[in-house]
Amino acid sequence: MANLPSCEDYEVSINVPRLIKCPKLSCGHVEKNALGTTINYVGGFCIVFPFYKSDGKKIAVRCWIASVDKAQERTRKIAEELKKVNLPYFVNFEYEQEGIATNSGVQPIVLMDWIAAKSLKDYIKDNLTKPDILRKLATSFKTMAIDLHKANISHGDLQHGNILIRDDGSLVLVDYDSMFVPSLAGFKDEIKGLAGYQHPARWNNENITAKADYFSELIIYTSIMALSYFPSLWAELKIENTETLLFSADDIKSGGTTAIFRKLDSHPELKNLSDAIKKSLRYNSIDDLQPLEEAIISDSERIMGKIRVKWGKRPVEKQEYCPDTTNTRAKWNRAN
């Protein structure tokens, strides 16, 4: 997909019915705001247009603005795998080769179900004064991570813009261009994600892998937990206006020596998470990283776990003795 159209090119074309070549979009229309401006959302590789089909159903139309190697094959294999594993965190999507005509020719597009949900940042912002809800969110996020690990799947670009939360608190992932599924083993790792979420070794990683999310999972989980204890960090770090959550690219490059790590180290419930990030940053390859559910186990918990495995639920078998107080009392009374 060389010489791809610009965002402006796509915006012009999607507003001209005869330039929309995909039959599934026939007689539909792109969404506009009150001023008549076309609504769109731009990422590093795609521009997304909210679109209403002829039956009134709202979908997302994703158009590439940067090349992704073997995009069609990737999309097909990802769709096949997601149907197979049937996890609740993904939406239906279809690759359409004949999508939209532009000055650069007819471009392929991806059609996805539109999800009525809040972005991760919006959800956190709305619940900053509700620590229990944020901790429940962190637990749900960890559960999702475990489910992905069991399926041998990684999203590849976990960050605030690609994680949505429905009203019931359930999580949805969007933007699948960077995903790993087993049938894509050996494909190039081209979409690396945002700097505030990625391990330094990710930038030199060659092929997509099931381990691509391990570090970003730890960053996101820690950020949510930290904000549940220190909601003031939201304003102090101006999180709403950044492309990060709790950690900046400089924080990650520091290896764990910046102020945010010292803040986490000061809280007994967060120090273990801070230590886990620092430990991860000592590795030179993402292949050496641990999944979230293992990374957040403290060293002491890990040791106790090994003891329990070896000795059972009770690490030390203790012989208990309860004296027969009734007989003792009777003997004492007779003696007196």
Residue ranges and their predicted role:
Residues G36-T38, G44-N92:
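ATP-binding glycine-rich loop module of kinase domains
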Residues Y89-K136, G186:
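Conserved structural core of kinase catalytic domains
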Residues A201-K211:
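Conserved end of the kinase activation segment
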Residues A226-A335:
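Helical subdomain adjoining the active site within ATP-dependent kinase catalytic cores
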